[in-house]
A protein has these predicted regions:
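Conserved, mostly hydrophobic/aromatic
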Residues: 19, 27, 43, 62, ...
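Auxiliary Fe-S-binding modules of radical SAM enzymes
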Residues: 1-7, 181-283
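Hydrophobic faces of well-ordered beta-strands that scaffold small-molecule active sites
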Residues: 11-13, 58-60, 90-96, 120-122, ...
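Conserved strand-turn element in the central/C-terminal portion of the radical SAM core barrel
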Residues: 99, 127-131, 151-175, 194-200, ...
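Canonical Radical SAM [4Fe-4S] cluster-binding loop centered on the CxxxCxxC motif
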Residues: 2-42
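Aromatic/hydrophobic pocket-lining residues that form the small-molecule binding cavity
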Residues: 43, 75, 105, 144, ...
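Conserved SAM/AdoMet-binding glycine-rich loop
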Residues: 51-153, 233-234
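Catalytic cores of alpha/beta
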Residues: 107-109, 167-185
């Protein structure tokens, strides 16, 4: 089971198995799972079973990689069951691919939000079309931006992520600037940065082993983060770059805390603040 860090204390219920796309070149998360959507009855049965051992559930996260792909009428039945079984629940969240948002009408999105789904986790990865093609994201930057904008208009809280180092040294600046532009247009409620780490089992790892891909070092990753922060205009977005994969930890609110975070990056780049050793980085 994979979940966002902020769902550490949530009840996790499997709505789908695996990821509906499952072809991103950097990802190993669901490679051993054949994607399928669990029956509505089984999901509701799991909720009822969880009620038996949980005295109070404030948050529920529906796994796996693209639970929002489920048909709207099915999710509405599950949302009604959540309200019946866990009336104390304050937040329901799940991962959402661009496709899973775009195939739904505005009325469907509003109905799903109104029924209780509060937060959608979305992966931008990069705003650079060349990078998105290279990593086989399965969506263009414009499609991802539109999906985020439509989700926001429907009332969802949107938590967006991107990945430092995806473009290598040669494409770093373009990746950073295009990602900053995409974030500025989407204006997510939350935006988090991870740093690329290659694991056996993903195509980018195979490229690395074959000598066709050179991962960026800490200086390039930090410069990339700096360019993003300099170019993002998303007032009020909660920004986090404190994932275990990152070389330094940053957190703040855009645009208010941007100058401070830029200074923290500069301190690390100049050697006045520590940079995480490779041995301590984790996914």
């Amino acid at each position: 089971i994979f979940r966002p860090p902020s769902e550490a204390y949530s009840l996790i219920v499997q709505s789908t198995i695996g990821c509906s796309h499952n072809r991103c070149a950097f990802c190993t998360m669901y490679k051993e799972k054949q994607f399928r959507i669990r029956s509505t009855e089984d999901v509701i049965a799991d909720l009822e079973s969880a009620r038996g051992f949980a005295s109070s559930i404030k948050r529920i996260f529906f796994a796996d990689g693209d639970a929002f792909i489920r048909k709207s009428e099915e999710q509405l039945k599950i949302s009604a069951a959540v309200k019946r079984i866990f009336p104390e629940c304050e937040r329901v969240s799940m991962y959402a691919s661009p496709k899973s948002v775009l195939i739904k009408t505005d009325d469907e999105l509003k109905a799903l939000h109104g029924a209780g789904t509060e937060l959608l986790y979305m992966g931008l990865e990069s705003g650079d079309e060349n990078v998105l093609r290279r990593i086989n994201k399965g969506a263009t930057a414009e499609e991802i931006i539109l999906a985020g904008q439509r989700a926001k208009r429907a009332g969802f809280v949107v938590s967006l992520t991107a990945i430092l180092g995806l473009a290598g040294d040669e494409g770093s600046a373009a990746h950073a600037k295009a990602t900053a532009e995409a974030v500025s247009r989407m204006k997510p409620d939350y935006f988090g940065l991870l740093s690329l780490m290659l694991e056996p089992g993903c195509p980018m790892y195979d490229e690395y082993r074959a000598g066709r891909l050179k991962p960026v070092g800490p200086a390039t990753a930090l410069e990339e983060c700096r360019i993003m922060l300099e170019n993002m205009d998303s007032e009020g977005t909660v920004f986090r770059a404190n994932h275990a994969s990152n070389y330094i930890n940053l957190k703040g609110t855009l645009n208010t805390d941007t100058p401070r975070m830029l200074r923290e990056i500069d301190r690390a780049l100049s050697g006045r603040a520590p940079i995480k050793d490779e041995a301590w980085r984790r996914l």
